[in-house]
Swiss-Prot record:
<dbReference type="GO" id="GO:0008137">
    <property type="term" value="F:NADH dehydrogenase (ubiquinone) activity"/>
</dbReference>
<dbReference type="GO" id="GO:0015990">
    <property type="term" value="P:electron transport coupled proton transport"/>
</dbReference>
<keyword id="KW-0496">Mitochondrion</keyword>
<keyword id="KW-0249">Electron transport</keyword>
<feature type="compositionally biased region" description="Pro residues">
    <location>
        <begin position="46"/>
        <end position="57"/>
    </location>
</feature>
<keyword id="KW-0830">Ubiquinone</keyword>
<dbReference type="GO" id="GO:0046872">
    <property type="term" value="F:metal ion binding"/>
</dbReference>
<dbReference type="GO" id="GO:0051539">
    <property type="term" value="F:4 iron, 4 sulfur cluster binding"/>
</dbReference>
<keyword id="KW-0809">Transit peptide</keyword>
<dbReference type="GO" id="GO:0048038">
    <property type="term" value="F:quinone binding"/>
</dbReference>
<feature type="binding site">
    <location>
        <position position="91"/>
    </location>
    <ligand>
        <name>[4Fe-4S] cluster</name>
    </ligand>
</feature>
<dbReference type="GO" id="GO:0045271">
    <property type="term" value="C:respiratory chain complex I"/>
</dbReference>
<dbReference type="GO" id="GO:0005739">
    <property type="term" value="C:mitochondrion"/>
</dbReference>
<keyword id="KW-0479">Metal-binding</keyword>
<feature type="binding site">
    <location>
        <position position="185"/>
    </location>
    <ligand>
        <name>[4Fe-4S] cluster</name>
    </ligand>
</feature>
<feature type="binding site">
    <location>
        <position position="90"/>
    </location>
    <ligand>
        <name>[4Fe-4S] cluster</name>
    </ligand>
</feature>
<dbReference type="GO" id="GO:0009060">
    <property type="term" value="P:aerobic respiration"/>
</dbReference>
Length: 215
């Protein structure tokens, strides 16, 4: 009986080792190869949307007519800018110089008007104080659409020399939206004239009739 038990104890580790070797031999030693059909395709980033493409459902004839109407409206607007004089400080002297005979703004169709209801542009020239700010906004609200604002001089742009004063607005763009900034203290007449010409270019890029058509 002791002999049988001894033989069984010695053979058991050998049997376990043989079964383990057989199980390991059935394992895959290498990864299966991928077929060509399962290879991932390369990712292509889509391009940005085109801003010059016509709206969907708009024919070529309608697109041509709409663009010509916009061109006609922009031509009339940029050729008849009527500024509202809002001189507040020494920059107003240069604004008056620009409107005088030497530079002759009339040849550009720019005519100063005394009433905001007859104007489509406001030239804020000078230092805007906290007490004058409500009046500026009231005059701006009386102007018909479309309307534009030119900030003339360092004081109107950001407070200028009086930036840290308790009674000065640090930029008229805190009260009304500004389209053109003319730097300088004070700016020359040529600088204001250049700002008006830039405003004409900005008006020429408007697409009011197209936006109205797509509503």
């Amino acid at each position: 009986m002791a002999m049988i038990t001894r033989n069984t104890a010695t053979r058991l580790p050998l049997v376990l080792q043989s079964h383990r070797a057989a199980a390991v031999s059935h394992l895959h030693t290498s990864l299966p190869a991928l077929s060509p059909a399962t290879t991932p395709t390369s990712y292509t980033r889509p391009g940005p949307p085109s801003t010059s493409a016509p709206p969907p459902g708009l024919s070529k004839t309608a697109e041509f007519v709409i663009s010509k109407v916009d061109d006609l409206m922009n031509w009339a607007r940029r050729g008849s800018i009527w500024p509202m004089t809002f001189g507040l400080a020494c920059c107003a002297v240069e604004m008056m110089h620009t409107g005088a005979a030497r530079y002759d703004l009339d040849r550009f169709g720019i005519i100063f008007r005394p009433s905001p209801r007859q104007s489509d542009c406001m030239i804020v020239a000078g230092t805007l104080t906290n007490k004058m700010a409500p009046a500026l906004r009231k005059v701006y609200d009386q102007m018909p659409e479309p309307r534009w604002v030119i900030s003339m001089g360092s004081c109107a742009n950001g407070g200028g020399y009086y930036h840290y004063s308790y009674s000065v607005v640090r930029g008229c763009d805190r009260i009304v939206p500004v389209d053109i900034y003319v730097p300088g203290c004070p700016p020359t007449a040529e600088a204001l004239l250049y700002g008006l010409l830039q405003l004409q270019k900005k008006i020429n890029r408007r697409k009011d009739f197209l936006h109205w058509w797509n509503k």
